[in-house]
Amino acid sequence: MEVVNAIGRRKAAVARVFVSEGTGKITINKRELEKYFPSSILQFIVKQPLAKLNVAEQYDIKINLDGGGFKGQSEAARLAISRALIKINPEDKAVLRAEGFVTRDPRAVERKKPGRPKARKRFQFSKR
């Protein structure tokens, strides 16, 4: 099997994933998963598609993460891994879609509007 790559985005985060046959090693920006995401919840989010398909020990995954915060980066990585696994085996798409791993979450920060302190907040109104 050659290297399969995919891209995932979430908020301001972009994840580029390279999946190859291996022993289940996940590397993010040249660091181990446990070093990059010390939080077990974020590690779990990244591993979710692999765990759902029971292929965690079959592939080595190299991830380049860019922008955003920890949560956005972990969810971008999850989407990219899901897309790469679908490229490898298209029959897995239904299982991953049922779990919601294939859908790109479009929610992002709403822009600040002129004449207001934030996107929706108004300056204090004085009646008199």
UniProtKB/Swiss-Prot annotation:
Region called Disordered, residue ranges: 107-128
GO MF, any single term: structural constituent of ribosome
Basic residues bias locations: 113-128
Keywords: Ribonucleoprotein, Ribosomal protein
Gene Ontology CC annotations of this record: cytosolic small ribosomal subunit
Any one GO biological process: translation
Listed InterPro entries: Ribosomal_Su5_D2-typ_SF, Ribosomal_uS9, Ribosomal_uS9_bac/plastid, Ribosomal_uS9_CS, Ribsml_uS5_D2-typ_fold_subgr
UniProt xrefs under NCBIfam families: PRK00132.1
Family statement drawn from the similarity comment of this UniProt entry: Belongs to the universal ribosomal protein uS9 family.
Protein name: Small ribosomal subunit protein uS9
Source organism per UniProt: Parabacteroides distasonis (strain ATCC 8503 / DSM 20701 / CIP 104284 / JCM 5825 / NCTC 11152)
Protein encoded by which gene: rpsI
